[in-house]
Amino acid sequence: MAHKPKKAACPSRAANRKKNTNSAHLEADISPWTEALFAAEILMLHATPVYYGFGVPRGDGSGVVIIPGFLGTDLYLMELHGWLQRIGYRSYFSGIGINAECPNLLVQRQLNQTIERALTETERKIHLIGHSLGGVIARSVAGQRPQDIASVITLAAPIRGTATSRTIRHAADAIRQRILREHGRGVLPDCYTGSCTCNFVDSLKRDIPRSMVETAIYTRDDGIVDWHYCMTGNREVDFEVPGTHIGMAFNPSAYAVVAERLARAQSSE
């Protein structure tokens, strides 16, 4: 069975932990080796009733756009896509290709087209689900298009900043240099950093309207990013599950939370 998700710790205590911890300590606390356990999460998912749609609220046919994480493609979200279809939603892959590009361009050139198609075909507001960097993108789009989004769900997404393993940081730096070389003046000088002044970064600072259901699912065993950054600080929004960062896309406990939160968004419309 899927583990019952736990609500986040008191926001004030989480904020104090974050305030008193420097970036060097944050990096030291991250252990990428635990991520090898994600394969067990896939096996566990297939052994749970949740995966087959039992014991979770049914969908209403509304559209759900799913967005892959850093260096990922829609392909690894096949399990999530199929599961959403089974429980009654119309699932859409993001169509962004490899998530290794300026996020602002990905949203403008690919993701917005997928969102428009989902809105047209379902004739109602849609839901966004993003894993890791895909969750940051989902949160940004929710800030840009609140009139079109019923709910936004982030899975192990560093929505409050980045503190990651050294390997991931080096990979991100290499991608940033490639983006600057390929696009030149087509992107801002601080592209692919939190200091960028593009619409993508700016929209992350906007508040989510109360009419939109927001959910941030995180794991304390995250071996890629510091889990504190995957929380909003709101106990009604943050949900802790056991598991790994990579495995969050296959995590039965996370799936159970997703189903409940999507159902809540239905009742809120």
Over which residues does each language-model region extend?
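Serine-dependent carboxylesterase/thioesterase catalytic core
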Residues: 63-75, 79, 85-95, 99-203
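Amphipathic, alpha-helical segments enriched in basic
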Residues: 42, 52-55, 59, 66, ...
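Phenylalanine-focused residue identity feature
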Residues: 38, 54, 70, 92-93, ...
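Detector for Asparagine
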Residues: 16, 20-22, 99, 104, ...
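Flexible, membrane-associating and regulatory peripheral segments of lipid-active enzymes
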Residues: 1-65, 71-82, 87, 93, ...
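Short secondary-structure boundary micro-motifs
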Residues: 40, 48, 60, 136, ...
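Helical cap/lid subdomain of alpha/beta-hydrolase-fold lipid enzymes
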Residues: 27, 143-269
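Generic hydrophobic, helix-prone segments enriched in Leu/Val/Ile
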Residues: 39-46, 111, 171-172, 227
